[in-house]
Amino acid sequence: MSSRGVTAPQGFVAAGATAGIKPSGNKDMALVVNQGPEFVGAAVFTRNRVVASPVKYTKKAVANGTLRAVLYNSGNANACNGVQGDKDVHEIVDYLASKLKVDPLDIAACSTGLIGEPLPVTMIKAGVDKLIPALGDNGGEAADSIMTTDTVAKETVVKCNGWTLGGMGKGVGMMAPSLATMLVCLTTDACVTQAQAHAALSKACDVTFNTLDIDGSTSTNDTVILLANGASGITPTESEFNDAVLQACADIADQLQADAEGVTKRVRITVTGTTTDSQALNAARTLGRDNLFKCAMFGSDPNWGRVLAAVGMADADMDPDNISVYFNDQPVCLQSGGTPEARQVDLSGIDIDVRVDLGTGGPGKAFVRTTDLSHQYVEINSAYSS
């Protein structure tokens, strides 16, 4: 995808900078600015009840009806910092607003990094001073600046009929439905209302980011933001706009899965044959979070017994004597018993498709995306601490 990302649509500028938050010295702040003429903003947030200070603030900003800018910092989550964390995000946003000459509630704030560490306000203000003069066609630098344990920047561009949608994202660990530990910013020069933007974003998140389950942990900071400015002068149909937002979210979700911490396998789990879609989703998530199953995927082992043991724990209607399991479309378990060719199924490739029929004949169906559990995942997360 284009390295321009969030600056691919007309009327958006961005920048990345080093404020010194990360001990590595890598870039750790980004700014995306909507130059108008319209300033539509919509967002979807974490469902974790422990919510970071920037999420609290950005919820208020989005409810205000307009968004002109999004400020990002990486290396510090500003989560679980109590009242001081709330004060700090207000102070930083007020500082940026004074520089941009806009209302503070026209600015969203997003943070990612270590939880429970005080926000280095002085550093971040100095970072703001670097970002503003650097604003331009710098979507790639902004995407680089929001990474934490990511190994590559994640960007997308969707070219439509006279209008464009761009985006960037970050996140490779602590991923589970309710987004993932991730921040995503989408921008478009299409003419849309806030209601249209919110509806499209919510629908897209449900079938992309909310199906991504790397390790069962849900972040305090998840935020997906969509900015629209109408600079193209084009008003797409509802279907056209929904499709573009879905395409962008799906692309970023694929990139998140591919760069998940320690990933050696990309696994898609589809569950059918239960009473409702929600039951199927529960079973798929239960399997996707099961460590024994994930270890089997790391070892390229078509261990259908671990699949049955995992889905048996799910809150879903099933016929325990009639469950079928397929790896890469090859039957390894039929009517809850192994097939003769089960151990010969080749799972040595990066992508593994797992299909489970719970055997009730019901219409319920759902899928999730996950990864294996590797040595590197443990190494990364044992080293990532305060």
UniProtKB/Swiss-Prot annotation:
Keywords: Acyltransferase, Amino-acid biosynthesis, Arginine biosynthesis, Autocatalytic cleavage, Cytoplasm, Multifunctional enzyme, Transferase. Gene3D superfamilies: ArgJ beta chain, C-terminal domain (3.10.20.340), L-amino peptidase D-ALA esterase/amidase (3.60.70.12). The record marks T112, G113 as: Involved in the stabilization of negative charge on the oxyanion by the formation of the oxyanion hole. GO terms for biological process: L-arginine biosynthetic process; ornithine biosynthetic process. It is an enzyme of class 2 (transferase). GO terms for molecular function: glutamate N-acetyltransferase activity; L-glutamate N-acetyltransferase activity. InterPro entries: Arg_biosynth_ArgJ, ArgJ-like_dom_sf, ArgJ_beta_C. Pathway: Amino-acid biosynthesis; L-arginine biosynthesis; L-ornithine and N-acetyl-L-glutamate from L-glutamate and N(2)-acetyl-L-ornithine (cyclic): step 1/1; Amino-acid biosynthesis; L-arginine biosynthesis; N(2)-acetyl-L-ornithine from L-glutamate: step 1/4. The keyword Cytoplasm applies. It catalyses: N(2)-acetyl-L-ornithine + L-glutamate = N-acetyl-L-glutamate + L-ornithine; L-glutamate + acetyl-CoA = N-acetyl-L-glutamate + CoA + H(+). The active site is at T181 (nucleophile). GO terms for cellular component: cytoplasm. It is found in: Cytoplasm. Pfam families: ArgJ. The keyword Transferase applies. Heterotetramer of two alpha and two beta chains. Belongs to the ArgJ family. Catalyzes two activities which are involved in the cyclic version of arginine biosynthesis: the synthesis of N-acetylglutamate from glutamate and acetyl-CoA as the acetyl donor, and of ornithine by transacetylation between N(2)-acetylornithine and glutamate. This is Arginine biosynthesis bifunctional protein ArgJ. It comes from Corynebacterium diphtheriae (strain ATCC 700971 / NCTC 13129 / Biotype gravis). The lineage of its organism: Bacteria, Bacillati, Actinomycetota, Actinomycetes, Mycobacteriales.
